């Protein structure tokens, strides 16, 4: 493994990290996913050596780097604002770390040209950062970080300052860059899109704790707790008594995909629910007729407005798995 974080805790202003432990494998794109205020950036800055932890250790390729200064850690950190040097050209920004390391001039030129070609910024090398778009600044920051061939690239909300169109395009390009350049990345974000599109594994951070770590598909389909499930979008939590593959809840008999027993709670994703005002033919396991009453938000000329909607509907939903409770199956 490239990075091992063991038991990191830190009280920093209003942020609190609590016993954070995880590892990043070579060539992996590891995502720390959490809401604003969860402590994601503080964790990244502790790993980078900008903030000193209160307890815990950090290892890079088996070496304890906890007490090393940032420049001795073999890491490259890209903050959310990219931190380009405004008085330098794009070429000199990318070359900065190489010049500090006294790399020969010819090698610097070769490296800058190679990276700028892969990242699509060859035409920008003579320009200053103030003339660049957000997407262009991000590419320059990534090139500058990768120029020094770090063991690990630390990315702090790398797409947060970009418009939706640019963000979608650069997320796709990030996949290509990693394939072509072969870097290892630790990436913090609040975006589900980034986690699903880029992550090999994801760690969910809530209130300063890393509460679940695993492959992206596994974490999103099998959250380890109700807290994680709600963060990941399981808005409908139903509690009832399970016996085998049957859950009895609120007068309903619900079929489960696996066996369970005792009192449990299950989560139903909004996208797993289908409504129809006609009799519904569906392969979904659970079909009911019910009356739906809801507030429906419409976007009008003067902004959003809310009206009441009421009617009888046929509905169907599937439950992918029981979520929580002593009787929940594995």
From Swiss-Prot:
Keyword Signal: no
Topology within the bilayer: Peripheral membrane protein
EC number per UniProt: 7.3.2.6
Keyword DNA damage: no
Localization (cell): Cell membrane
Subunit structure comment from the entry: The complex is composed of two ATP-binding proteins (WtpC), two transmembrane proteins (WtpB) and a solute-binding protein (WtpA).
Protein name (record): Molybdate/tungstate import ATP-binding protein WtpC
Organism annotation: Thermococcus kodakarensis (strain ATCC BAA-918 / JCM 12380 / KOD1)
Organismal lineage: Archaea, Methanobacteriati, Methanobacteriota, Thermococci, Thermococcales
Gene: wtpC
């Amino acid at each position: 493994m490239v990075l091992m974080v063991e038991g990191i805790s830190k009280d920093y202003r209003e942020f609190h990290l609590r016993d954070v432990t995880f590892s990043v494998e070579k060539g992996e794109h590891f995502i720390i996913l959490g809401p604003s205020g969860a402590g994601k950036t503080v964790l990244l800055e502790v790993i980078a050596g900008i903030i000193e932890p209160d307890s815990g250790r950090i290892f890079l390729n088996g070496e304890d780097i906890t007490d090393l200064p940032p420049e001795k850690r073999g890491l490259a950190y890209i903050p959310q604002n990219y931190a380009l040097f405004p008085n330098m050209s794009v070429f000199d920004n990318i070359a900065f770390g190489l010049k500090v390391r006294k790399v020969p001039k010819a090698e610097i030129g070769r490296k800058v040209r190679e990276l700028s070609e892969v990242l699509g910024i060859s035409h920008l090398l003579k320009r200053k950062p103030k003339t660049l778009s957000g997407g262009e600044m991000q590419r320059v920051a990534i090139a500058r970080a990768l120029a020094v061939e770090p063991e690990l690239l630390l990315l702090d909300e790398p797409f947060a300052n970009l418009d939706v169109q640019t963000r979608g395009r650069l997320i796709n390009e990030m996949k290509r860059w990693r394939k072509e350049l072969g870097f290892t990345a630790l990436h913090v974000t609040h975006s589900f899109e980034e986690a699903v599109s880029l992550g090999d594994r994801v760690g969910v951070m809530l209130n300063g704790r890393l509460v679940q770590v695993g492959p992206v598909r596994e974490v999103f389909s099998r959250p380890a707790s109700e807290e994680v499930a709600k963060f990941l979008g399981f808005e409908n939590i139903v509690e009832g008594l399970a016996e085998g593959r049957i859950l009895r809840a609120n007068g309903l008999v619900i079929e489960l995909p696996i066996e369970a027993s005792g009192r449990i709670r299950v989560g139903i994703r909004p996208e797993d629910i289908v409504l129809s005002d006609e009799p519904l033919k569906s392969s979904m396991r659970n079909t009911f007729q019910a009356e739906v009453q809801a507030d429906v938000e419409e976007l009008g000329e003067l902004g959003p407005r809310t009206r009441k909607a009421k009617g009888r509907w046929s509905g169907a939903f599937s439950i992918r798995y029981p979520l929580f409770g002593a009787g929940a199956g594995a």
